[in-house]
Amino acid sequence: MLVYLAEYLTQFYSGFNVFSYVTFRAILGLLTALIFSLWWGPKMIERLQMLQIGQVVRNDGPESHFSKRGTPTMGGILILAGVFISVLLWGDLASRYVWVVLFVLASFGLIGFIDDYRKVVRKDTKGLIAKWKYILQSLAALVIAFYLYASADLVGETQLVVPFFKDIMPQLGGFFIVLAYFTIVGSSNAVNLTDGLDGLAIMPTVMVAAAFALIAYLSGHVQFANYLHLPYLPGAGELVIVCTAIVGAGLGFLWFNTYPAQVFMGDVGSLALGAALGVIAVLVRQEILLVIMGGVFVMETVSVILQVGSYKLRGQRIFRMAPIHHHYELKGWPEPRVIVRFWIISLFLVLLGLATLKLR
């Protein structure tokens, strides 16, 4: 929004032209979201405590988690508010890239909010019924998938980028809708499954978002895109502001979510952030790269699938408990050790993913 004001003021003072640079606005976007989260965080935590909106803890979970019962949750609202304020201030609101991500954040955030509300306010431990949660997620994802496919007017917007192979970029056609759908819904639920320990989900989310900020910048710059054999996507640079806003809001939230957590993000945060990473990957045509960089999310999801499948087919469990972070807790690892080691794995995978941009 402020970019338009700066554009108008440029005629009076050329220094305002600096706001036309994506990198400058991205830095301001990160700082805005970070400062907002740090400033508003204590007030929100206090408000959640007053409303008695506390975490519901599974009785069959690790005993160390029983002490978390009652910790304020739904803190994802803080993250989403920081992202929205930052993007609306510093983003180019004429960009469809911006509005696509904001729609996904809002729609999946609303689904998560309903789920959290039923759990912590209505005291319904099941929350939103899984069937309805999946239906609502599917509707939101399909709306975006069909919109992106129908509005695609460049070849690169529906190509699939295959890491390590610069000359393999198949045209997806209608399969684009299927891939976009599963990427958005899958990423949303994967981050949700990962959000089981203090700070475990938010830090990998920040890392992946930071990596996508770089990729979006490169994809929106014709010379860099051609040099790295990426699809050139005019206007994709505006996604940099969205990604850095997620980074800033996420780091601000981590200040209060780090062990021992003062607040949890809840489904309102995890479902929305996961879906946002998914749709950003779709927009910059890096769905496969998301699997690599978001490997921690993939690992958590696969552990649940294997656990459920093994129990139903063989009557035996592979892990002591799923998702896999609980397995290591039950093996005796202290919670901070599990968290930091998963962060290290995430950092390695993000760097590996970025390396594939050149290793092709």
From Swiss-Prot:
Its EC number is 2.7.8.13. It is a multi-pass membrane protein. It is found in: Cell inner membrane. The chain crosses the membrane at residues 21-41, 74-94, 97-117, 135-155, 168-188, 199-219, 236-256, 263-283, 288-308, 338-358. Pathway: Cell wall biogenesis; peptidoglycan biosynthesis. GO terms for cellular component: plasma membrane. Coiled coil: none annotated. The keyword tRNA processing does not apply. It is an enzyme of class 2 (transferase). One of its GO terms (molecular function) is UDP-N-acetylmuramoyl-L-alanyl-D-glutamyl-meso-2,6-diaminopimelyl-D-alanyl-D-alanine:undecaprenyl-phosphate transferase activity. It comes from the Bacteria. It catalyses: UDP-N-acetyl-alpha-D-muramoyl-L-alanyl-gamma-D-glutamyl-meso-2,6-diaminopimeloyl-D-alanyl-D-alanine + di-trans,octa-cis-undecaprenyl phosphate = di-trans,octa-cis-undecaprenyl diphospho-N-acetyl-alpha-D-muramoyl-L-alanyl-D-glutamyl-meso-2,6-diaminopimeloyl-D-alanyl-D-alanine + UMP. PROSITE patterns: MRAY_1, MRAY_2. One of its GO terms (biological process) is regulation of cell shape. InterPro entries: Glycosyl_transferase_4, PNAcMuramoyl-5peptid_Trfase, PNAcMuramoyl-5peptid_Trfase_CS. Its cofactor is Mg(2+). Keywords: Cell cycle, Cell division, Cell inner membrane, Cell membrane, Cell shape, Cell wall biogenesis/degradation, Magnesium, Membrane, Metal-binding, Peptidoglycan synthesis, Transferase, Transmembrane, Transmembrane helix. Belongs to the glycosyltransferase 4 family. MraY subfamily. Catalyzes the initial step of the lipid cycle reactions in the biosynthesis of the cell wall peptidoglycan: transfers peptidoglycan precursor phospho-MurNAc-pentapeptide from UDP-MurNAc-pentapeptide onto the lipid carrier undecaprenyl phosphate, yielding undecaprenyl-pyrophosphoryl-MurNAc-pentapeptide, known as lipid I. This is Phospho-N-acetylmuramoyl-pentapeptide-transferase. It comes from Shewanella sediminis (strain HAW-EB3).
